[in-house]
Amino acid sequence: MTIRLLSWNVRGLNNPRKREVCKNLLKDWKCDIVCLQETKVSSTDIVFVWILWGSPFIDWAVLDAVQSSGGVLLIWDKRVFEQLDIVVGQFSVSVLLRGVVDDFVWAYIGVYGPNDDGQQSFLWEELLRVQARWPMAWCLVGDFNIIRYPSERLGCESFSPAMFAFSNFIESNSFVDLPLEGASFT
């Protein structure tokens, strides 16, 4: 089964025009599951999600923004995936899903990482707790607010301890870091 997945830092969805752009793109791309980061929405409800997705056949999980900062929204087509469990953390929202057609069980985790390098270790610990709870296939997406390599950020010329920690987290958990597509680097 091919999954149409989208992970997108929307940089705010409080503006009605921005929501309309998001809705149109989700409709055009016919996604099965999406992760929207940095929603900046402090109270997400079903009407808000329905308006974005444009179909009643949805389920969703959210980590609401705190004082219009952050926020992660996962939305999926419930004709494709059945929700088995949800975990909402400080920096992530995770959902355990089963494919309706193939019964494949996997975890989809959306992240909006802390902007402070000193807080990154809390994100790694949070994700490891979810991994211990659901030791199966994962798809980990989002904006980690950290880079692995200096070439990923304009003007960055050297590795920082936080970059080494991020690379170590990825490698020690056998994750695959897919390249960024469709947007410029920060």
Where are these regions (language model features)?
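A shared catalytic/ligand-binding motif for oxyanion handling
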Residues: 1-186
